[in-house]
Amino acid sequence: IAYILKAFADSLFGNLMTVDTAAWFESFSMTSYSVIPYHIIVVVGTLLTLFLGARSIEKTNKIMMPLFFIIFLILAARVAMMPGAWEGYKFIFTPKWEELIDPMTWIWAMGQAFFSLSVTGSGMIVYGAYLSKDENVISVSQHTAFFDTIAAVVAAIVIIPACFAYGTDVGAGPSLLFVTLPAILQDVPMGQLFAVILYAAMIFAGVSSLQNMFEAV
């Protein structure tokens, strides 16, 4: 989240829209202690939301998350028009059936599912404690899994085709968020505004996850 806060700040002031994103990310991530101020801000900010009440984060997320989806759909349309994007779609949607017989495929998939849904963490326990007794747990769980999967697919159809269009390694990890995504935003109208909203939405989503970790402690 500290890295995302850095990206948000540079988007807000326009710096991220005018730099070589790969050089920007490398300079920041490889500089000793550069992330500490942002990390402190994130930790203190999260603690304040817990002390002062987390309802504001919940209300904000109800606005930011739909905006997040809308902007990603706009970016998906832009990426679809880039040369080489089709190779990205083939990479995503061409099944490799032989991989299903590899036990590690299932282990990685289950690990990703557990992490993404906070099944093995404190998230379900903490937020479940606040759940109304009138809620249908099975129905809510189904909705959570469904929308989590939709979010992953939407992100994939933006990032992966863009990797092929820009010649970026699809297995690059965090740099996809801080190199590939900003590069796309530099190429679209109102890219700076979209960048500010996207990274702000990611911060709110991240803080909502940190809240349950801190509260469990």
Label the model's feature ranges.
Residues 1-55, 84-107, 174-178:
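Inter-helical loop and helix-membrane interface segments of multi-pass membrane transporters/permeases
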Residues 58, 62-211:
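Membrane-embedded translocation segments of transport machinery
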